[in-house]
Amino acid sequence: MKKTLAALIVTAFAASAANAAVVYDNEGTKVELNGSLRLIMEKADKKVYNAANQSTKKANSALRNAGSRFGITVKHNLDNDFYALGRLEFRFDDTTSRDKFGRLYAKRAYVGLGSKATGDITFGRQLTIADDLSQAVDYEYGFIPKSEYIPTAGTGVVRYDYKGIEGLQLSANYNFGQTNDEKGNPLKPGIKNAYAVGALYTVGDLDARLAYGHTNFETGASYAHRLDGVLASLGYKFGDFTLTGDFGYGHEKLDDAKVNKFYVAPGFAYQVVPASKVYGNYLYERAKGESDKVKTHGFLLGADYKLHKQVV
């Protein structure tokens, strides 16, 4: 089955910078409040073609929330270069309404212990290293399907990060069982457990990233459902011009059924003037089972303008 998605999206996106305001700083304890208001006005026309080359057209327009959030970060210095840290972040998009401003919910909530020499370990509702495994400029649209290969977040995650070498970040995480997302919506299928390891490396104009993850899903039966995924991302700057490439490979097994899938997503970004850039991305994804094959094509073109140092 071949699935082609052609979309024209005209948007106006406004986001205030997530600047932090220090509300307390005394005796080794620092408390910061931060947040941003993110609104998007969009008009979208979309065509989906099926295997018989028949198209279905949908149109949509909205002025909506695009991930507005606020949070509090706490850090307390301990003895011997160690420190305790924690973060609580709230968002508003727990709703089915078109404006996406709904009930407040906790998107992130974690605590941990860290040291510059040995790294940080954190526990709770947080991102995993897989969230950093893309460099495409796609803002709100989540163009790169990396979360379908390795979970990019979880409600019960233990994560370790080491940044003791300049330009290098090493990370590992373990996800405990999860049957609902941060909003309380059921995951289908639920996650029994998962783990991932990854590395981010920057030197000069080169940005290279790599991660591997293994996920076991809930089945409610004696057979297993698991997914092994590899993500990679490369970026290189040529002055004001940046080329990126995001890649993913996954091998999924449900009982005796197997699916192999991959995606390739080249992209670019050009800083036309200090306040504005243009960008574009292309996505090709293929999933092949024992009796069927699904191909997906997608593209995204955009431009942004920085009206103020705190408004894009």
Locations of regions flagged by a protein language model:
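Gram-negative bacterial Sec-dependent N-terminal signal peptides
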Residues: 1-21
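Glycine- and aromatic-enriched membrane alpha-helices
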Residues: 22, 183-188, 291
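Outer membrane beta-barrel
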Residues: 22-44, 57-177, 191, 200-204
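Gram-negative outer-membrane beta-barrel proteins
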Residues: 41-49, 92-98, 129-133, 178-182, ...
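Short, surface-exposed loop/helix-turn segments at secondary-structure junctions
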Residues: 52-53, 100-103, 292-296
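Repeated loop/turn-to-beta-strand initiation elements of outer-membrane beta-barrel proteins
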Residues: 81-84, 117-121, 166-170, 205-210, ...
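Detector for outer-membrane/organellar transmembrane beta-barrel domains
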Residues: 189-300
